[in-house]
């Protein structure tokens, strides 16, 4: 992602991706 909220967006994206892998 990009933009001024990259840190927040990146953290959320990481959590979503991790959750997606765990609950596949």
Curated annotation (Swiss-Prot):
One of its GO terms (molecular function) is bacteriochlorophyll binding. Keywords: Bacteriochlorophyll, Chlorophyll, Chlorosome, Chromophore, Photosynthesis. GO terms for biological process: photosynthesis. The keyword NADP does not apply. It comes from the Bacteria. It is found in: Chlorosome, Chlorosome envelope. GO terms for cellular component: chlorosome envelope. Belongs to the CsmB/CsmF family. Component of the photosynthetic apparatus which may bind the chlorosome to the bacteriochlorophyll a protein monolayer. This is Chlorosome envelope protein B.
